[in-house]
């Protein structure tokens, strides 16, 4: 009984290693494409950063924040400036 359990565990271990190696080999081609994907995502986030920052968005000056928001110097985030006008 102990021998059959050990053989079963050994076979499962070999199958796991074999499946992991096959998956690694298959995903190797995906890793070559990932820098282009990361660059496109970076462009998306950079374009959003050029617009005004919404509530609790990071900022360095008041002009970074949207209307009715001001840059709070304590933690550098956009917060309501207390105004109600349009």
Curated annotation (Swiss-Prot):
Q: Does the keyword Protein transport apply?
A: no
Q: Which GO terms describe its molecular function?
A: ion channel inhibitor activity; toxin activity
Q: Which GO terms describe its cellular component?
A: extracellular region
Name the domain of life this protein comes from: Eukaryota
Compartments annotated for it: namely: Secreted
One Pfam annotation reads: Toxin_12
- Propeptide residues? 22-51
The alphabetized UniProt keywords are:
Disulfide bond, Ion channel impairing toxin, Knottin, Secreted, Signal, Toxin
- Entry annotated with the keyword Methyltransferase: no
Disulphide bonds in the chain: 52-66, 59-71, 65-78
Question: What tissues express this gene product?
Answer: Expressed by the venom gland.
Q: Where would one find the signal peptide in this protein?
A: 1-21
Principal location listed in the UniProt entry: secreted
- Give the family, as the similarity comment puts it: Belongs to the neurotoxin 10 (Hwtx-1) family. 41 (Jztx-36) subfamily.
Q: What is recorded about the domains?
A: The presence of a 'disulfide through disulfide knot' structurally defines this protein as a knottin.
Q: What does this protein do?
A: Probable ion channel inhibitor.
Q: What is this protein called?
A: U13-theraphotoxin-Cg1b
Originating species: Chilobrachys guangxiensis (Chinese earth tiger tarantula)
